[in-house]
């Protein structure tokens, strides 16, 4: 099967209050316990990723008084705790500007969006952003873009390869009702390829890559045929 990304770290947390209101707290800060020696940092290091390699965070950003400051503070505080260099921007994808309120499926869209970022190297615009809440000025790492921004190499809209290094990693959080938080760090699929090559050799990697690319091409053909009415999509 093709690999769209590698889970570098995943965990769920609770704040302890467990009050069922849509004002998530900061329980996911526990991902940074230990700072530069936290499990988050150590797990990513096994895949060759440092805190400064994390390029983007995909957040809900509900435009509510409770969510936006909390979620932004969470990621900015974590960035400092795990040793991200001062001045290294952490670009933000505000999920709900792209899909609206997806309810329980929101973080699935966020994770899928990160895999698309690995493929394209382009951060989507927060198109509906008129101004950033002044409360977020304290969060010095966080950057919201209003236009698509290419930050790495990948495929353009015509499938052509563009120059640049791949985007190594991104974060996604799901801060839900009841003060229960989900946190995932996703790593570029190149980490999977490196693991296959190390374990089974370059020949095995090329064999997998050939099968995976054939499956991707077949899926794309099927999608386009369905869009043109030449085949049933489902």
PLM regions and their residue ranges:
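Glycine-/small-residue-rich "gating" segment that lines the acyl/pantetheine channel
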Residues: 1, 142-165
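Condensing-enzyme catalytic core mediating Claisen C-C bond formation in acyl metabolism
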Residues: 1-49, 55-56, 185-234
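Conserved phosphate/anionic-ligand binding catalytic regions in large, soluble enzymes, centered on
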Residues: 101-107, 174-184
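Short glycine-aspartate micro-motif
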Residues: 4, 56, 126, 170-174, ...
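Short, well-ordered loop/turn and helix-capping segments at boundaries between secondary-structure elements
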Residues: 80-81, 114-124, 186-192
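A beta-strand-loop signature enriched in Asp, Gly, Thr, and Trp
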Residues: 39-58, 68-98
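Acyl-CoA/ACP chain-elongation machinery
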Residues: 1, 10-27, 59-69, 86-144
């Amino acid at each position: 099967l093709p690999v769209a990304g590698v889970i570098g770290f995943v965990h769920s947390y609770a704040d302890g209050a467990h009050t069922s209101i849509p004002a998530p707290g900061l329980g996911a800060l526990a991902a940074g316990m230990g700072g530069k020696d936290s499990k988050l940092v150590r797990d990513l290091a096994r895949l060759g990723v440092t805190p400064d390699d994390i390029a983007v965070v995909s957040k809900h950003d509900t435009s509510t008084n409770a969510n936006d400051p909390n979620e932004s503070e969470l990621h900015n505080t974590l960035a400092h705790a795990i040793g991200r260099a001062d001045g290294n921007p952490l670009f933000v994808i505000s999920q709900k500007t792209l899909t609206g309120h997806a309810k329980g499926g929101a973080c699935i869209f966020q994770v899928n969006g990160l895999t698309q970022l690995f493929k394209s190297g382009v951060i989507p615009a927060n198109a509906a952003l008129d101004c950033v809440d002044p409360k977020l000025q304290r969060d010095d790492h966080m950057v919201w873009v209003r236009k698509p921004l290419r930050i790495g190499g990948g495929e353009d809209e015509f499938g052509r390869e563009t120059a640049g290094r791949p985007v190594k990693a991104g974060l996604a959080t799901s801060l839900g009702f009841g003060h229960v938080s989900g946190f995932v760090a996703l790593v570029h699929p190149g980490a999977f390829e490196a693991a296959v090559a190390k374990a089974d050799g370059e020949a095995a990697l090329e064999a997998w890559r050939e099968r995976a690319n054939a499956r991707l091409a077949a899926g794309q053909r099927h999608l386009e045929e369905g869009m043109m009415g030449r085949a049933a999509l489902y």
